[in-house]
């Protein structure tokens, strides 16, 4: 289980305070107004910023003192962050070794990851030779090839057209279920949350105002701001 206990972070005069428990293997949609703290939560978990107080832990192991590279997270953002001068094969391989010194077994892992996301035919191409959706598949393969139990996704498919976004969401759900990966995904789309999430966390004014099973995310919820958010999104 991933836990955040009284995790406090100050940005200028704004306080972000998070308490959350995430069961292993669940897919959690992080939702809420812009600027509420969704990306801040992911940045704290990833180690890009440090909390002033509180604890973050995975199965009892404290994460606060670990560097970003030591933490058990793979990350995927709206910007695919591919290296333009590297082939698809090498961009995926970076998920296994930053110096691209792969064993034969790791090379097979790269090819398998590419096949699972449907880009095995493009392994020797450069990113500029791919479509936007194909580039995001490369980024997803690099995320998937890493042996981490948790994925942090920050609106990774929001720039894609609706059909392609649905395809990528289905792919994330499929891959996560196959490997029992825990997923925390920031999204502004209620349809995305309903499509793949098992749970949701509604973030408002720097704190987790409501959370629970995705089925409870409806107009009958007891939290008024969440109901307003839900009605605006429908």
From Swiss-Prot:
<comment type="function">
    <text>Part of the ABC transporter complex ThiBPQ involved in thiamine import. Responsible for energy coupling to the transport system.</text>
</comment>
<dbReference type="GO" id="GO:0005524">
    <property type="term" value="F:ATP binding"/>
</dbReference>
<feature type="domain" description="ABC transporter">
    <location>
        <begin position="2"/>
        <end position="230"/>
    </location>
</feature>
<dbReference type="InterPro" id="IPR003593">
    <property type="entry name" value="AAA+_ATPase"/>
</dbReference>
<dbReference type="GO" id="GO:0005886">
    <property type="term" value="C:plasma membrane"/>
</dbReference>
<dbReference type="InterPro" id="IPR005968">
    <property type="entry name" value="Thiamine_ABC_ThiQ"/>
</dbReference>
<dbReference type="InterPro" id="IPR027417">
    <property type="entry name" value="P-loop_NTPase"/>
</dbReference>
<keyword id="KW-1278">Translocase</keyword>
<protein>
    <recommendedName>
        <fullName>Thiamine import ATP-binding protein ThiQ</fullName>
        <ecNumber>7.6.2.15</ecNumber>
    </recommendedName>
</protein>
<dbReference type="InterPro" id="IPR003439">
    <property type="entry name" value="ABC_transporter-like_ATP-bd"/>
</dbReference>
<feature type="binding site">
    <location>
        <begin position="32"/>
        <end position="39"/>
    </location>
    <ligand>
        <name>ATP</name>
    </ligand>
</feature>
<keyword id="KW-0997">Cell inner membrane</keyword>
<dbReference type="InterPro" id="IPR017871">
    <property type="entry name" value="ABC_transporter-like_CS"/>
</dbReference>
<keyword id="KW-0547">Nucleotide-binding</keyword>
<keyword id="KW-1003">Cell membrane</keyword>
<dbReference type="Pfam" id="PF00005">
    <property type="entry name" value="ABC_tran"/>
</dbReference>
<comment type="subunit">
    <text>The complex is composed of two ATP-binding proteins (ThiQ), two transmembrane proteins (ThiP) and a solute-binding protein (ThiB).</text>
</comment>
<dbReference type="GO" id="GO:0048502">
    <property type="term" value="F:ABC-type thiamine transporter activity"/>
</dbReference>
<keyword id="KW-0813">Transport</keyword>
<comment type="similarity">
    <text>Belongs to the ABC transporter superfamily. Thiamine importer (TC 3.A.1.19.1) family.</text>
</comment>
<keyword id="KW-0472">Membrane</keyword>
<keyword id="KW-0067">ATP-binding</keyword>
<dbReference type="InterPro" id="IPR050093">
    <property type="entry name" value="ABC_SmlMolc_Importer"/>
</dbReference>
<dbReference type="GO" id="GO:0016887">
    <property type="term" value="F:ATP hydrolysis activity"/>
</dbReference>
């Amino acid at each position: 289980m991933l836990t955040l206990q009284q995790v406090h972070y100050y940005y200028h005069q704004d306080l972000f305070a998070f308490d959350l428990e995430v069961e292993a293997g669940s897919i959690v949609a992080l939702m809420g107004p812009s600027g509420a703290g969704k990306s801040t939560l992911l940045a704290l978990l990833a180690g890009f910023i440090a909390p002033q107080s509180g604890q973050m832990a995975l199965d009892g192991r404290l994460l606060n003192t670990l560097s970003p590279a030591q933490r058990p997270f793979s990350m995927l953002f709206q910007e695919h962050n591919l290296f333009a001068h590297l082939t698809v094969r090498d961009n995926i391989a970076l998920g296994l070794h930053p110096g691209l010194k792969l064993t034969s077994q790791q090379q097979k892992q790269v090819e398998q990851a590419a096949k699972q996301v449907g880009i095995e035919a493009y392994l020797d191409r450069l990113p500029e030779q791919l479509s936007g959706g194909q580039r995001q598949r490369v980024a997803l393969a690099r995320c998937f090839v890493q042996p981490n139990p948790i994925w942090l996704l920050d609106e990774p498919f929001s720039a894609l057209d609706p059909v392609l976004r649905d395809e990528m969401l289905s792919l994330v759900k499929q891959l996560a279920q196959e490997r029992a990966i825990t997923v925390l995904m920031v999204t502004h789309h209620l349809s995305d949350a309903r499509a793949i999430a098992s749970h949701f966390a509604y973030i408002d004014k720097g704190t987790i105002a409501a959370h629970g099973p995705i089925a409870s995310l409806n107009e009958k919820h007891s939290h008024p701001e969440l109901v307003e958010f839900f009605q605006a999104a429908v």
